[in-house]
């Protein structure tokens, strides 16, 4: 073989010196060693002469070599070929080697090659084909000269063959066989192949593959494999080759061969050297002589080195890790370039992700990382998040994955940081919140977009870097692309996403994402709440637009995707499949595996959003153009502009509720998401209501549908600490119930958060109606809340207290105030508030009674006069209700105010708009503004709870009550469902409060109308509804409802088992009696069998001992053993029954009783007791005696055995028994068996009765147990035991009859005597 030592620079051929075979070996490590060994082998070929010839020989191209050279040499096509190979690899999913071969065969006709691969070329056929070719070539090239030439010529073939031969001779050691002319060559080839494929691959790839285009296919296939891969050898060759051959994971598609270097960040050096070396390759061939000479000497050593390195490398290579050999390098590069300082940390996470990421992806990371860093640098403001992004998001996908899995903590922490700072940094104050929102939305959307962008970009880069990217994109993008595609399919409104300008400065977006997340957590005002859903929706919406493109590209990657995606497509798609709300939570949680209440939703948005944002950041880097669109899309989707408008503190606050509502109307566009919400919001409040409550809330969310959704989900979930607390429940549940109250809580909390998180919004919110948006309570807080004291934090105390005060005031003394404060006491505050406060307070409102029930919801508006109880007046009241609303708001908080809200609600709608006092409703008023009606409804339903939920004030107040708020929400929700009033509107409000959070926006609007009307109607239902909600809510807490079903089942089992328990134990016991056979055999096995083995005499004596002493022991031992296992089993095995089985004590009692009744060994005595101890004992003895009569031999043995076993009784029994059963013993078997049968049939009842009397539980239980047997509906556990029990019950009879049976046996067989002995000992065991 020619001295193609040319060590691929990457390949381990560190020393590229062609001439130095050994040095090459050293450089290459195993690979070079292989090279050396093969050369040595060539020299060694065994024929020194041949060796000389190879040195001397100037490689003559054999015809085959010429053909190979021609085939391999289409340098002009290389760039195209790389593309073709990549394309074919993608299309056919064949190995790169096969693809290249097919291309060669088909003249690089892509279509023909594809057909060839798919239709004609079986898997591996090509490899076989080449092998055949090679061998003939090798055979032909037996001559030394031929050898050198042949080896040279075959180098290409070898490369082809390498893959096959790769393992053929791992040790260069085969060189020893070189003496065999051509075989030595073959060995060398194999070694070289191995070398090339292994560590040597670098060398070989360098020597071979790169220079020759075709070699690239062949040699590269092999050499390329190793060379670029370097140690990996697999990844190294041309893209075409390296991908399959090289890393078989390695950049399957690299950039153009020339670009390989650039294409793979890490590969570059190795590859470039390889490329250069490719040219040198020829020279290396000349060097073959020197190498061979050197190799001969070190050949073995090299072989060793080869073997070790090769072996090792081989395993690594073979283990197809998606991380390219370059991976670490690129990861480092990504970290270094992309990571930035934050990148270091993020990168560590991202890196981890990256490592898992396909190598190609990492290349993206490398370049993107750099780009990302640059971008992050450009981003500047987001620099910190971007750094995290750049690092963690080094690759958008990685980032995405990392964000999904890793980021949440970062997201949250950053979110928190950014909340105040980040948001501000993100934009102006309002801008900041906008940023947050957009960021959050962007984050998620960005995640989607980032994923889409990532996919696109990855695909673009794939195109650029044909080699590496495909896999990476395939790896992550598949899942993500699927996921995002699903999102896209669900995409709320691509338009929504598309709108946002990048302005948030992607960085702000990122910061926002974090802060937003926190905002979301905090509530981030409407934004916070909205943000996540916005993000989520945006992901769908913006992603929808982006993804459509992405998706196409993704599809390209997808070809390979199937292997890489390890996350079930369903899991990924889940969120898209279902309503954004629940599944979004679930999916995110699923991805994050965060089931924590906060983490599941809030963290997820944060991490999800943040990761998205990071990705997006990279998109900036990674796919700046795409991102610009996406960003604008995402950001726009985020409502950046809207948020900028609405959210900007002044702007948002400035926006009248009407304006907000308008926005909400646009938000209603959110109906995409919102529609889903509307699903949550059957109240219809979702869409229209969104304009009202959600509008404000959602508008701030500004993420149109997202807002709505978000509001409900994010805001409600995220915002409310309560939701956070209950996030798991709240997440899914909240939208409906929690969402409403949670947003209330959220709102409540959000305001705090908002105030903290979104200083601009927060500040504004508290100050202005926007606050209502902020959770309207906040807004309400600003106006009403302050009066209410609903102020966000005050919520519990001030807000709550104030309502409480108001409530108390209006409530008068009604305990409700505390009850409302007890709002924690859900029913109390709600019911009390509503009913009580409304009711007592209803003094003000005639509706009070209904009001109580409905929370005056039925009074709905009028009751809602709320404080006033004016339904219609409510409208009027609502306006006056401003004051009244105030009071009412207090009432709202009180819940009485809910009435006022209702009244105010409608009025409150008015008030809502104006309703400073409504502010309590204020959220209703402000948030509800348009939704005031809803607020009023809300007010009614929740009494501001909904309004509060809308207004958040009541909710906030209740939220202060917290659960009360929740319950109120729930109640409201239900009532909302029932009560349009708070719930209807409240649905907007209440629901808005909870579901309504999103819904609230919508709910509120709808709610207001619905609220009062629905409120009234549903109001009456409200209480029960609330109860349902509560129960349902509690049920979630309770899962006991199901458990009760289980418990019920359990109960049945237990009940049946109660008899069964004893019966079950009895079965245990019975198995013992059955065991009497068994156990007697077993116990006797210990005594008789074992003893018999030891000595029958002892055995007999042993039973004798057993009769007196051991009887107790065995009873203690055997019975307890049974009990213990059963007790254990009942506990462990029969859990439910186990409890009941907890009665094992009964069984033990039963056992002694049974023993007593049965008589231990002496079931005979006990039986005899029933029948006459003498007779019974005689029965056994009789068997013996009879046996004696019937079978003297048996009798003797039996007598001995039995006598020994039972001696005392045995003797007695035998005498009596023999006389009694002498008759039967004539027809020994029949009589005994018959009697035994009879005993089962006839005797057992008496026996059971006797036992029942004596054993009491035992027989009765078996009997009772027997009944339950059919009764055992749950025959799973029970059935078997019962089944056993059934047999065992008979057994128990046998147990008693066992002696008789044993008699029979004993009479029939000497063994029987032993069995008698067994039964006695067994019975003794019983006792």
UniProtKB/Swiss-Prot annotation:
Q: Region Disordered: what ranges?
A: 1-65, 129-311, 335-439, 488-552, 601-638, 749-792, 851-906, 1182-1219, 1236-1256, 1287-1327
UniProt keyword annotations, A-Z: Behavior, Cytoplasm, Phosphoprotein
Q: What is its main location?
A: cytoplasm
| GO CC annotations, alphabetized | cytoplasm; nucleus
Q: Where is the composition biased (Basic and acidic residues)?
A: 44-58, 180-198, 204-215, 1287-1297
Q: Which residues carry this modification: Phosphothreonine?
A: 657
Q: Record's superkingdom?
A: Eukaryota
Cell location: Cytoplasm
Question: InterPro entries this protein is in?
Answer: TC-DDR_regulator, UBA-like_sf, UBAP2/Lig
Q: Where is the composition biased (Gly residues)?
A: 7-16, 226-253, 420-431
Q: Which GO terms describe its biological process?
A: copulation
What's the short name of a Pfam family annotated to this entry?
A: UBAP2-Lig
Domain UBA per the UniProt entry, residue ranges: 80-120
* Residue(s) carrying Phosphoserine: 656
Keyword Phosphoprotein found: yes
Composition-biased stretches (Low complexity): 33-43, 140-156, 376-396, 507-520, 614-638, 759-770, 779-792, 854-867, 873-906, 1298-1319
Polar residues bias: start-end ranges = 488-500, 532-552, 749-758
What does the protein in this record do? Acts in the nervous system to mediate the control of copulatory organs during courtship.
Q: What's the protein called, per UniProt?
A: Protein lingerer
List the top taxonomic levels of the source: Eukaryota, Metazoa, Ecdysozoa, Arthropoda, Hexapoda
Name the gene behind this protein: lig
